[in-house]
Amino acid sequence: NGVSRTPMPTDAGNFGLLDRRVAAEVARLLDRVPTSTPLELRDRALFELAYSSGLRAEELVSLDVASVDYDDEQVRVEGKGGKTRIVPIGEHALSALRAYAERARPALSPTRSGAATSGGGEPALFLSKSGRRLSTSDVRRRLRVWARHAAVQAGASPHWLRHSFATHLLEGGADLRAIQELLGHASLSTTQVYTQVESARLRTVYSRSHPRA
């Protein structure tokens, strides 16, 4: 996934400000993706899901239509090493996915230049304008487009959304073991990079709360 471009807090007093700023940038990026055309609906669903469920770019493009369980509000993800995990889908992402599935995906999969039809066999959830499965480079390119449109300052990438997902879960009270499972990390040690965030948060709480801090 590369190195995260979301800056880690270096000053405990700045942690709350940093977390709010990153959350605001993510929200602004997602909200600035229009929903007027099939490609816009696709992109909105793609990036809402990336942030809602913390998926890697490779995992996003490998999703099939059947991967999404709308009734149970979850997605089945084939992660690294062929390991499968079930991840919840948030309300905003689920709404965006429904809009994409109903209004956009059929329009992206007509028989055109050999592209598969929606009923003819292309199982991919996210389709290109030619009706084929998106590539990871497509995902990164489209995210850069919308990041510029939203004037997002941080280096926007799929991993930036994934890192923000984990950071905001930790800030909201989730424990590392739960985050490990949601991210699909094989080892807890991989997830422990987020202890830097937790340490900064605890230091902020301590500094604000202890009379002799």
Describe the predicted segments one by one.
Residues 1-213:
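Conserved catalytic core of the tyrosine transesterase superfamily
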